[in-house]
Amino acid sequence: MTELEGEIQVLDLPHYVEGPWLHKRGDLYYLTYASMGKGREMMHYATAESIGGTWTYRGALTGMAENSFTIHPGIVEFKGQWYLFYHNASLVIGIRPEPQVAGVFVWTIFTICRMVPWRTWNRRRTE
């Protein structure tokens, strides 16, 4: 985890609820977050040229979470491909949310194309 020294900034992002995820690709910072849809959360995002902003709202990244009120993003690069991780409320073992992965990102100059679930990764107990 990285900590920045300075004053705490409050960002006024449309539909923001919780669960921010910050990452950098090239020279651009991306802030992805859980946002309120019509009854369930979805993901929206904003971009900035510096970590201190000014942040530009870019819109929805996903539709509403399936089977769940909550959805939190995690975006990572692995072997040259970008992936979006999130969860829904399908229960696999006990009370833990089921993790999901949406396919490889398609990037344009400043935006991420809207994501559609690609493959479900289920954590299964092996005996």
Q: Model features per residue range: what roles?
A:
Residues 1-127:
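Carbohydrate-active catalytic/glycan-binding domains of CAZyme proteins
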